């Protein structure tokens, strides 16, 4: 039975052909920034594949054993079975270290790509109506991704992961009234408890991945149903999408890009070492030291705990420690992230549906707020390693702490002001080109002796030869002659590849035309010289 016969039989029963044809003809934009979400998706797939392999050999038990494995420096040392099996994966399981490091690199790439993807969504206004739900799903995905990563690198029960868990325990216990109950719910007792790794393991390999899968599916379904956003441009409106069809071109590109991400992670895992737990030793509560930093996506929370002043609050019989304010700050940031689309809609009064994106320069307030938040995040991340910087650069740790505190107040305000002025300046630059044209670099002398630069109009001119100002449509404004097809041709090739065939053909035509013009000029000059010589001979 042929595939055509099978397809006809299915279509006669379920009438699937028209729906499938319509779906595989769906169009996706080709802008490079849309690949950021794909990186997160492919990283998550790598996480699932490598995580399944690691679960075959890992034992999350905190039961104490005497290590007698392949890493000789730790032989005879008492440790938990979790740490011992993590060492066995690294040194005795075939390909275990490679898979473990690939899993760790994929976790970093997963969270970081989601953060960068969220920045793209924010700065281009892709969260506006009707996509508020997808924005909320994205925020929840980032929070769950960070929690999943934190639980993942806490499972080996090495010294660094134990320090991170101790900090988390202190923050939870510091919550007034509910802190103790939440701590017992999460850790199963006082820290360290016999149940904490078992509970983290179940959450890490079952509960959170299942939620992530459901949210990713919902996220992609909404993108598919609501159509993709796109940047303004020629022929692009709020009611269409210009790009490539999902079959076959987009599908082929997606598979190829997924393989590139997989290969990049494999390369990182093969040539770089990350989370060398054998150098840290098993967790011991008495061995907390400097230089204990979490992964980069959680470093900002550690920085917040480091720069927070030691403000303790006493309410009756309750003592609220300083780390409580860190939890409050995290909660406020999450609430602001979730509600930002509605806050912006409230202040701007914009309740329309939007399928076209915005250039960041066109919304200076939002762009400035985003840069301000980004600077705040970067300063907290840098503060998370203030002890390392103090030791490496021989600076006082107290000075580094105060630099972080002052920077968190002054830095975002300065970033807001500079970004706002840059956006206004870029808007003026675009409108100047639309009004006067593109600078050609050609200097012309006026009858009065003044020199001016000749501009190439982007549109029609009036009766006096002056360009008629064009309206700004939200798309990128050309600033160079070769972007208009002048000044030879626009070059689209790169270091690793030639120009496209049409560009090369056009370049050859221009070169040939220039050669003919040069030959004609030389011929005319030669004829003029011959004629002049004849006239001089007659005289």
Swiss-Prot record:
InterPro entries the UniProt entry points to: Cyt_b/b6_N, Cytb/b6-like_sf, Di-haem_cyt_TM
Principal subcellular localization: membrane
TM spans (from-to): 38-58, 107-127, 135-155, 167-187, 205-225, 254-274, 323-343, 369-389, 406-426
GO molecular function annotations of the record: metal ion binding; ubiquinol-cytochrome-c reductase activity
Disulphide connectivity of cysteines: none
List of residues binding heme 1: 103, 204
Enzyme type, top EC level: translocase
EC code(s) of this entry: 7.1.1.8
Similarity annotation: Belongs to the cytochrome b family.
Role played: Cytochrome b subunit of the cytochrome bc1 complex, an essential component of the respiratory electron transport chain required for ATP synthesis. The bc1 complex catalyzes the oxidation of menaquinol and the reduction of cytochrome c in the respiratory chain. The bc1 complex operates through a Q-cycle mechanism that couples electron transfer to generation of the proton gradient that drives ATP synthesis.
UniProt protein name: Cytochrome bc1 complex cytochrome b subunit
Chain's gene name: qcrB
């Amino acid at each position: 039975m042929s595939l055509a016969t099978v397809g006809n039989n299915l279509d006669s029963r379920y009438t699937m052909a028209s729906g499938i044809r319509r779906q595989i003809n769906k169009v996706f934009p080709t802008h490079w920034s849309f690949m950021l979400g794909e990186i997160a998706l492919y990283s998550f797939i790598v996480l699932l594949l490598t995580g399944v392999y690691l679960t075959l050999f890992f034992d999350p038990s905190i039961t104490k054993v005497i290590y007698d494995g392949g890493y000789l420096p730790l032989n005879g040392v008492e440790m938990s079975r979790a740490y011992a099996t993590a060492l066995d994966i690294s040194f005795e399981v075939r390909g275990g270290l490679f898979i473990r490091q690939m899993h760790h690199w994929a976790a970093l790439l997963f969270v970081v790509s989601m953060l960068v993807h969220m920045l793209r969504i924010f700065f281009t206004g892709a969260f506006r109506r009707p996509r508020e739900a997808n924005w909320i799903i994205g925020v929840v995905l980032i929070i769950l991704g960070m929690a999943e990563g934190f639980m993942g690198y806490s499972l080996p029960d090495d010294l660094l992961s134990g320090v991170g868990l101790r900090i988390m325990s202190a923050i939870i216990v510091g919550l007034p009234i509910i802190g103790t109950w939440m701590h017992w719910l999460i850790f199963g007792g006082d820290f360290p408890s016999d149940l904490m790794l078992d509970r983290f393991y179940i959450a890490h390999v079952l509960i959170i991945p299942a939620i992530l899968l459901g949210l990713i599916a919902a996220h992609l379904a909404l993108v598919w149903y609501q159509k993709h956003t796109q940047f303004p441009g020629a022929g692009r409106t709020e009611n269409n999408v210009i790009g490539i069809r999902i079959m076959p071109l987009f599908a082929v590109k997606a598979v190829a890009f997924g393989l590139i991400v997989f290969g990049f992670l494999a390369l990182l895992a093969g040539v770089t070492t990350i989370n060398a737990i054998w150098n840290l030793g098993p967790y011991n509560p008495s061995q907390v030291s400097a230089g204990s930093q979490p992964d980069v996506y959680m470093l900002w929370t550690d920085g917040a705990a480091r720069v927070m002043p030691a403000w303790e609050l006493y309410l009756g019989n309750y003592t609220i420690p300083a780390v409580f304010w860190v939890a409050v700050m995290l909660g406020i940031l999450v609430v602001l992230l979730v509600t930002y689309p509605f806050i912006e809609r409230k202040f701007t009064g914009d309740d329309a549906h939007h399928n076209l994106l915005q250039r960041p320069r066109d919304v200076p307030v939002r762009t400035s707020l985003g840069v301000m938040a980004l600077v705040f995040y970067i300063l907290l991340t840098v503060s998370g390693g203030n002890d390392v910087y103090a030791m490496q650069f021989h600076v006082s740790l107290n000075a580094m702490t105060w630099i972080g505190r002052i920077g968190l107040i002054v830095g975002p305000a300065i970033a807001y002001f500079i970004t706002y002025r840059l956006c206004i300046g870029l808007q003026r630059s675009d409108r100047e080109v639309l009004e006067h044209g593109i600078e050609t670099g050609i200097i012309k002398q006026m009858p009065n002796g003044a020199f001016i630069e000749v501009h190439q109009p982007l549109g029609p001119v009036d009766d006096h030869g002056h360009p008629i100002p064009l309206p700004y449509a939200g798309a990128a404004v050309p600033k160079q002659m070769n972007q208009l097809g002048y000044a030879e041709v626009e070059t689209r090739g790169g270091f690793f590849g030639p120009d496209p065939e049409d560009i090369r053909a056009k370049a050859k035509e221009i070169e040939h035309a220039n050669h003919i013009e040069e030959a004609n000029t030389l011929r005319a000059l030669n004829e003029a010289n011959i004629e002049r010589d004849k006239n001089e001979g007659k005289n």
